[in-house]
UniProtKB/Swiss-Prot annotation:
Belongs to the class-I aminoacyl-tRNA synthetase family. IleS type 1 subfamily. It comes from the Bacteria. A motif ('KMSKS' region) lies at residues 623-627. L-isoleucyl-5'-AMP binds at E582. Pfam families: Anticodon_1, tRNA-synt_1, zf-FPG_IleRS. This is Isoleucine--tRNA ligase. NCBIfam families: ileS (TIGR00392). The keyword Transit peptide does not apply. The gene is ileS.
Length: 965
């Protein structure tokens, strides 16, 4: 390059004007902050988004949107999720499917309620009634939805943004009442007293999906001794040895049951202790003469914990201990040992479980079996109530544990206290611990339709397949679903309670009436109207007898009803949906709640396929958090940060490219270094497209038809490779393996095009006469590449694809890339027989280029055209491929010297003595020599110059003919 410019300077004349140089308005820089919104405007103006998919003539494809929560700014999790969905929808649109994507939002629940309350002054909060709160919550949610909606649109996401589904809309709330009603009438919903996860900080019951388990939770665990007052009859029969029998009976004041618990505050609620009938237990005495009952397998651990030696007196099966009596540790009452289940193990503790039926599900089940009192000793705020007797008023998450432990210690019942690290449920919204608390709640009886749900899971395709095992095990093991919440911001449970008595009014008439009211007026009428207006006409005369319930439904019941409120209701969608796509945490959330409601109502799953993705982490694999300062903001990725040198504006397409680049089935990293790498890939693809566009500026395929058989071998291979790449990309999209698309795209643009085909094409494009076949044939191929490249990248790089399409220099039938259908090629383009020879020739080209580069590094030459190459083959495959090229190749294009971009190439039997370098490898001997002749000042090839150019420049015969000299 330098030598050419120097030569032209010396002569004072340049042939630049005679070359066919690149010409296009498609800029090297994306300028995405300005250009991408312009493209959105073009789509909107020409109805190239949602309406395009809706008017297709193919089959319906429904990707049902799992509703994000209408609170807070968009984050990388939103980006990963929504871009994945959009890639699929755009691909299906190009395939001709009817695609109508309805975005949705989850609008009810505590986080919005708390945001509203936090925005008010204390006196405003005190004066705010439920209806006022709902009005403010509605306004808040709509503002959040609008902010998120604009963000999604900026990412290039297509959807029915004018008609999204919102769980606060009247038609949605009405449909949800319909789902609840059908489940109730099918016998799957009931009201009962049961321990539920209770959040004292939120003052409401929580579902399993509303819990999180921080890694660093420590509980105050205690070992407690309970004084045995009476041995069971079975144990007495076991005591054949008279001395031992007498010893135990005479030592009842020193005979204890050893229990272990991590919730000391539940001790006042103790109604029994439970054992596993299959575990062996021992009565063992310590050095002080005290005798303790605990599991045999835990002797060593208990000795170490309590720092005591124990002597085993009696070994008994757990089943023999039933009925043994002990004195309650804090109350003046006596309780018994009962038979528990497999939840009692010897992994930790003593193998004997303190049982408070009002504060644990296993405890509750045992209590039901033995008809024990189901006593709740805690109020909704987490304070111990009158049933805790002397501890009444203490808070279970504050002072109750310490004072109860102190009382046990004072009464010589405390054996040990220590901190214990374990998984403990927290309220996912307030980030504070929860408790188990027995209250009257509404439940969905999963047991009633569990087998149907498990069968439905089998009928669904789960991607990845591990998702099936995950949700299957969850449904197998899950208890009844607590669906009632003690909050105002939600859809009310449509039930009326008898004021005087325990009657409950809910039936077909009341459900249908409430459903129709909500359809017309919305759920606010439940708080606005009195019972007389809410009840069906049949019951209005007795409205004084009833009062409406104030519980609302679990938000997972809200979103879990979306199949009924959206997919069943909208004609353009279908139920079951083709695809649900969300994060892997939704196996216990939306996937499961949707499955349970759909199966309970219609005995079928709401989806045909479920696809899951992982979470977005920082570059070091850590969870993003403000405290760590590692949060990556998608808005900053697109528009840049305050310091654009540190946080440049990459645009939405780089964000979308990131989504396509990762294995989203697992957690995925994102950060500044990754973004730089992605930006480089984006730039390479863009520059490849620019080169293609810039070299077809004077070409129109409609005016010049070229027969495939006329094309040079290189061009035939390139079209074959285009077909192969398109097929590979299609398979990647079909299988939702977008990272394969990313890899294929990189390889195609860099390896196949930039480093090979387009590198070789420079001489054809720049130097040839404008209409010369060697140039036109290349332009034909490039036009096919650029059009189809735009289409196959458009699901991911939608803005770049449209930008490419708008800069195609000739007329196209389609005004947008998205009006073009997915590529279909003439059969004649696919010619895999070319691959073996071309592959060999490319391999040889790489080795020769290495040798030339070695000479350049040692400053023996400047450009490759300053060399010629001698090749002595020692590999028949490569020799045959060169012969094939020589025999069948086009003499103006398929000369191997042109593929190498050297001035001459020779296959020799003997090497020259005078050379720059010799490389010897398994392909043969490669010799690099200085090119003979003089350099043509137009094409830079070294040849025997016979023509004197303008102002004493030198021209080869080819160039002289082209410019008519």
């Amino acid at each position: 390059m330098k030598s050419k410019h120097n030569k032209e300077k010396k002569s004072g004349f340049s042939y630049k004007e005679t070359l066919n140089l690149l010409k296009t308005d498609f800029s090297m820089r994306a300028n995405s902050v300005i250009r991408e919104p312009e493209i959105h405007e073009f789509w909107s103006r020409n109805k190239i988004d949602l309406e395009l998919g809706s008017t297709n003539s193919g089959k319906n494809f429904t990707l049902h949107d799992g509703p994000p929560y209408a609170n807070g700014s968009l984050h990388m999790g939103h980006a990963l999720n929504k871009v994945l969905k959009d890639i699929i929808n755009k691909y299906k649109t190009l395939q001709g499917f009817k695609v109508h994507f309805i975005p949705g939002w989850d609008c009810h629940g505590l986080p919005i309620e708390l945001k509203v309350l936090q925005s008010l002054k204390s006196n405003e909060r005190r004066n705010l009634d439920s209806l006022g709160l709902r009005k403010k919550a509605t306004d808040y949610a709509k503002i959040q939805i609008n902010n998120q909606l604009e963000g999604f649109k900026r990412w290039g996401i297509w959807g029915d943004w004018d008609n999204p589904y919102l769980t606060l809309k009247k038609n949605y709330e009405s449909a949800q009442i319909g789902v609840f009603g059908k489940m109730f009438l099918n016998g799957y919903i009931y009201r009962g007293l049961k321990p539920v996860h209770w959040s004292p900080s939120s003052r409401t019951a929580l579902a399993e999906a509303e819990l999180e388990y921080p890694e660093e939770h420590f509980s105050k665990s205690i070992y407690v001794s309970l004084n045995i007052t009476k041995l069971s009859d079975a144990v007495l029969l076991k005591l054949e040895e008279k001395d031992l029998r007498n010893k135990l009976l005479s030592s009842l004041n020193k005979l204890f049951i050893a229990i272990w618990t991590t919730t000391p505050w539940t001790i006042p609620g103790n109604e029994a202790v439970a054992i596993n009938p299959r575990i062996n237990y021992v009565f063992a005495s310590d050095q002080n003469g005290n005798i303790y009952l605990f599991a045999r397998d835990l002797i060593s651990e208990i000795c170490e914990k309590l720092d005591r030696e124990f002597n085993v007196l009696l070994d008994v099966k757990g089943s023999l201990l039933e009925g043994l009596e002990y004195k309650h540790p804090t109350k003046n009452k006596f309780c018994n040992i009962v038979i528990g289940g497999d939840y009692i193990t010897t992994e930790s503790g003593t193998g004997i479980v303190h049982t408070a039926p009002g504060h644990g599900m296993d405890d509750f089940n045992v209590g039901q079996k033995y008809q024990l009192p189901i006593t709740c000793i805690v109020d909704e705020k987490g304070n111990l109530n009158k049933h805790a007797e002397k501890f009444c008023g203490l808070n279970v998450l504050k002072d109750a544990n310490d004072l109860i432990i102190e009382d046990l210690e004072k009464n010589n019942l405390l054996l040990l206290k220590e901190n214990y690290k374990h998984r403990y449920p927290y309220d996912w919204r307030t980030k504070k611990p929860t408790i188990f608390r027995a209250t009257e709640q509404w439940f969905a009886s999963v047991e009633g339709f569990r087998s149907s749900a498990l069968k439905a899971i089998e009928d669904v395709e789960w991607m990845p397949k591990t998702g099936k095992k995950r949700i299957y095990s969850m449904v197998v093991g899950r208890g009844d679903w607590c669906i009632s919440r003690q909050r105002s911001w939600g859809v009310p449970i449509p039930v009326f309670y008898e004021k005087e008595g325990k009657g409950v009014l809910i039936n077909t008439e009341t459900i249908n009436h409430i459903k129709s009211l909500f359809e017309e007026y919305g759920a606010d009428v439940w708080w606005e109207w009195d019972e007389k207006k809410l009840l069906p006409e049949k019951y209005r005369n007795e409205s004084d007898r009833w009062e409406k319930g104030l519980d609302t439904m679990d938000v997972w019941f809200d979103s879990g009803s979306s199949w009924a409120a959206v997919c069943e209701q909208r004609e353009e969608l279908q139920y079951p949906a083709d695809l649900y796509l969300e994060g892997s945490d939704q196996h216990r959330g939306w996937f499961q709640s949707s499955l349970l409601t759909s199966v309970a109502v219609n005995n079928k799953p709401p989806y045909k396929t479920v696809l899951t993705h992982g979470f977005a982490l920082d570059e070091n694999g850590r969870k993003m958090s403000k405290s760590l300062g590692n949060v990556v903001d998608p808005n900053i990725i697109i528009n840049g940060g305050p310091n654009q040198k540190i946080q440049p504006a990459y645009g939405a397409d780089v964000l979308r490219l990131w989504v396509s680049s990762v294995d989203y089935s697992v957690d995925v990293p994102i950060g500044s270094n990754i973004l730089k790498q992605l930006s480089d890939v984006y730039r390479k693809v863009r520059n490849t497209a620019r080169y293609l566009l810039g070299n077809i500026h004077d070409y129109d395929p409609a005016l010049e038809e070229i027969d495939i058989d006329q094309l040079p071998l290189l061009d035939q291979w390139m079209l074959n490779r285009l077909v192969e790449v398109s097929d590979e990309v299609t398979i990647a999209y079909e299988n939702y393996e977008f990272s394969k698309f990313f890899q294929i795209l990189q390889s195609f643009c860099v390896v196949d095009l930039s480093n090979f085909y387009l590198d070789i094409a420079k001489d054809r494009l720049y130097v040839s006469a404008k209409t010369q076949f060697r140039r036109r044939s290349c332009q034909f191929v490039m036009s096919r590449i650029v059009e189809n490249l735009a289409v196959i990248i458009s699901p991911v790089l939608c803005h770049m694809a449209e930008d490419i399409w708008q800069n195609i220099p000739y007329s196209t039938i389609e005004k947008s890339v998205f009006e073009r259908r997915w590529p279909k090629f003439p059969e004649s383009w696919l010619n895999p027989e070319l691959n073996e020879h071309i592959s060999n020739l490319r391999t040889l080209r790489v080795e020769i280029n290495k040798a030339i580069e070695g000479c350049r590094t040692q400053q023996m030459i400047g450009a490759a055209l300053e060399t010629e190459v001698n090749y002595l083959p020692e590999n028949e495959f490569f020799k045959n491929s060169l012969s094939w090229l020589d025999k069948f190749g086009n003499k103006e294009v398929d000369l191997y010297r042109d593929w190498l971009i050297v001035s001459d190439f020779n296959i020799v039997n003997n090497l020259s003595k005078d050379c720059l370098s010799i490389d010897n490898n398994e392909l043969g001997k490669i010799q690099i020599l200085k090119a003979k002749g003089l350099k043509c000042d137009r094409c830079w090839h070294y040849q025997n110059i016979t023509v004197k150019g303008i102002e004493n420049t030198k021209l080869c015969e080819r160039c002289a003919n082209i410019i008519n000299l």
